[in-house]
C-alpha cells in the first residue's frame, strides 16, 4: 500500500492509527454485527459513541459545564447565517475581517442586521492580523466575530481581540485542537472538523448556555436554532453519525498523544521546519508577516506563476499532493494540520 504526502486544506489527513481502527470495525462495530454507518442514531451503541466523543472533547479543551457541545451539519458556512439568526438581538454585530471566510461571514450576517467591519487586513491582501487592542466596538453590538486562523492566507490571531465586554464568536475550523484554548474567553467557538479532527460533514459548535435561547430572529428555521440541537443532544434529526464516530476516535488519539500542549509543541516543530527553510531560500518566499504566521497553513511563492506551476507538478510526481495554493491567491500552500507526523514537512523542505 502506498500513501502519499497529502497537504490538502481539507478534507485533510487523519491519523493512520484511527483509519486502521475504523477499518477493523467497518463491518462489525464491537460485536453488534453492523457498521456504525448502518446503526440507528437512537441506538444504545450510538448513544455511547456520541456521549463519549463529547466527554473526550470536553476533557481535551477543558470545556466548562455551562457550555454546550453541539455536533451539527451544514458546514462552517452555514454558521455564517446561523450565528446572526440566533445572536443578533440588537441586530448589530462587529466583524474583524482578516480573510475570505470572515469576509463571507460578514456579508451573510449583513442580511440580518447592521454589520460593522471594525478592523481589516484587506489593504495588504490579508497578509497580517490588525491591531485589535483598542477596537471601535459598537456599544449595541451583540457580538464580535473573528476567523481565528486563516486557511487561505496563513495568518493566525496570536492574541484574542479586546472586545470590551462583548461576546466573542470565533471560527476555528483550521486550528481546532491544534493548541490549548481558554474556552471561557469565547461565547461561541465553532468549526468544520475536516481539517484537524475528522471527515467532512460535521460541524462542532461550543456555545455558552446563556446564548442558547428561544429569542431568535423571526423566521429562523427550526433546524437553524441552537436551542433545537442543544435540547435534543445533537439528535434532533439524524446526525452525521459516522463522522462523529471518527471524530471521537481522533479525540481519543489526541488524548493518547498527550493532549493539546503536546500537539502545540509538535505543531510548532513542524511549522518551524518549513518557515526556517522558506526564510533562507533564494527561490521561495512566504507571503505573511512573521509575527502573524499560522502554525497550520503556510502559503509561499516563487514570484513566477510558471515556476509555481512547475513546482506543484513536480511535487505531485514526487508524491507530494495538494500543494497548489487556493484558487483566489495562487502560489503554493502547505497544510500542517495536527494529525501528520513532522516527516511530511521534512519531505517538502528537501
Question: Could you say what each language-model-derived stretch is?
Answer:
Residues 77-142:
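PLP-dependent aminotransferase-like
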Residues 10, 109, 121-176:
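Active-site phosphate-binding strand-loop segment of PLP-dependent enzymes
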Residues 169, 183-194, 203:
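Conserved active-site segment immediately N-terminal to the catalytic lysine
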Residues 3-54:
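A glycine-/small-polar-enriched, mobile loop at the entrance of the PLP active site in fold-type I
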Residues 337-343:
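Conserved small/polar residues in nucleotide/adenosyl-binding loops
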Residues 284-315:
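Conserved PLP-binding catalytic core of the aspartate aminotransferase-like
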Residues 15, 193-275, 289:
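Active-site C-terminal subdomain of aminotransferase-like
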Residues 32-79, 86, 100, 108:
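Conserved N-terminal alpha-helix of the aminotransferase class I/II PLP-enzyme fold
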